[in-house]
C-alpha cells in the first residue's frame, strides 16, 4: 500500500493544471511507493484558486505561499508560479524541510540558481 505524499501546489496556470493532472494519473500508470494527495493549492486570487481546487480535487487553498510552505501537513511543494518567484519560494521550502519540485526555469540566472542549491 503506497504511503501518502501530501502535495502543496503553488500556481494554477497551465503548468499547475498539468502537474495536477499528472498527480491524479500517475498511480494508474506506475506502481508508486507514494500516493500523491492533493492537499493544498495556492494563488493570490482567492476566488480563482478555490475554483481550481474544486475542479482538481485539492483539499484546501491558501492565498499566501508562505503559509502553504509552513504547513505541517505538506510534504512536497510544487512550484508552478511565475518564473521570477521560483527562487524565493524554493529557498523557503527547503528551509522548511519540504521536498521541492520546481518548474523550469529553476532561476532567472545562474547566480540565483547557485543561491538555491
What are these regions (language model features)?
Residues 1-56:
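N-terminal Rossmann-like dinucleotide-binding module
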Residues 45-47, 56-117:
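Beta-loop-alpha module in the N-terminal Rossmann-like domain of NAD(P)-dependent dehydrogenases
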